[in-house]
Amino acid sequence: MDATKWTQGFQEMMNVKPMEQIMIPNNNTHQPNTTSNARPNTILTSNGVSTAGATVSGVSNNNNNTAVVAERKARPQEKLNCPRCNSTNTKFCYYNNYSLTQPRYFCKGCRRYWTEGGSLRNVPVGGSSRKNKRSSSSSSSNILQTIPSSLPDLNPPILFSNQIHNKSKGSSQDLNLLSFPVMQDQHHHHVHMSQFLQMPKMEGNGNITHQQQPSSSSSVYGSSSSPVSALELLRTGVNVSSRSGINSSFMPSGSMMDSNTVLYTSSGFPTMVDYKPSNLSFSTDHQGLGHNSNNRSEALHSDHHQQGRVLFPFGDQMKELSSSITQEVDHDDNQQQKSHGNNNNNNNSSPNNGYWSGMFSTTGGGSSW
């Protein structure tokens, strides 16, 4: 190949000619082949114009470029307004788009997705911002601060007896639930002993005679001027005056329990001493059967008062029952004495009569007949 032909071919290549023209040499030997190979292939373009092979390749390249541009133009380059907040701070979702027919968009203002031709997602993506969290926590703390001021105090301070005395009489119309004084006995003999351990003395009729105490607090019951303790009510059987409306005798009356004879333990509660001594002259242990001597009956009588304690709380009913029993026993004893001729020196009588006369004698000594 000559140098001139080489330079011409290089210039033609620089002018970017079609491959068919570059591959075809200018000699006569290849002309018949070129005529057969260089058929004018007519191709219809998008515009409907038929072109030859030389122009078809250029048009096809241009069509490819226009197709890429058309695809890029199909994607929205401009920012759309959010259908919820109408803001332009939106973006097209390239990666999490599920279908090209309904492209997906995202609003950065309200943090919501929406699709073109679809519905708006109402739930925001992610959480709220940190600024909103701080504001919500501060509002909740303000609510907690305002709630205790509106609610009543469920734990009022405990008022002792020295604070109750300072109150006026008009303000002491409550139920007097704090009438158990704790540190009120500075004026009494025992400084550290509570007042409810010092019981008032009882009279025979069962009414309460209160101690002389400097107290201005009125009790629940109208007749008492000092605080009434629970132990005091149990002892007296709630036998207060009739105007108070309480006349119950479920506990022993004052004649059966005297404050001078009641023994108190260290805890302040009375020991169960003889609340109701029995009027019968025989013991319930059935000791000493058949012995009718006066010494034996006196020993049984003393033994009964030391050991046989009747601890029934129903004082008045037991008193009436015991008195009726002794009257019946005395009546039977008198009939037996009359039937036997009132023979007090007869020691050879039947053991049954001697037993009953010795046991049911009211004097305690008994008579042997």
From Swiss-Prot:
Task: Locate the residues binding Zn(2+).
Answer: 82, 85, 107, 110
Positions of Dof-type zinc fingers: 80-134
Cell compartment(s), UniProt: Nucleus
Q: Name one GO cellular component term.
A: nucleus
Q: Which UniProt keywords apply?
A: DNA-binding, Germination, Metal-binding, Nucleus, Transcription, Transcription regulation, Zinc, Zinc-finger
Q: Where is the composition biased (Polar residues)?
A: 284-297
InterPro entries given in the database record: Dof (IPR045174), Znf_Dof (IPR003851)
- Low complexity composition-biased segments: 214-224, 342-362
Q: Name one GO biological process term.
A: positive regulation of seed germination
Top-rank taxon, per record: Eukaryota
Signal peptide region: none
Q: Could you tell me which residues belong to the region Disordered?
A: 120-149, 203-224, 284-304, 322-369
Recorded GO molecular functions are: DNA binding; DNA-binding transcription factor activity; zinc ion binding
Tissue and organ distribution: Expressed in the vascular system of the mother plant, but not present in the seed and embryo. In maturing siliques, found all through the funiculus connecting the placenta to the ovule, but not in the ovule.
**Which PANTHER family does this UniProt record tie to the protein?**
DOF ZINC FINGER PROTEIN DOF1.4-RELATED, DOF ZINC FINGER PROTEIN DOF2.5
Known role: Transcription factor specifically involved in the maternal control of seed germination. Regulates transcription by binding to a 5'-AA[AG]G-3' consensus core sequence. May ensure the activation of a component that would trigger germination as a consequence of red light perception.
Give additional notes from the record. Answer: The regulatory role of DOF2.5/DAG2 appears to be opposite to that of DOF3.7/DAG1. Both zinc finger proteins may act on a maternal switch that controls seed germination, possibly by regulating the same gene(s).
Name listed for the protein in its UniProt record? Dof zinc finger protein DOF2.5
Organism of provenance: Arabidopsis thaliana
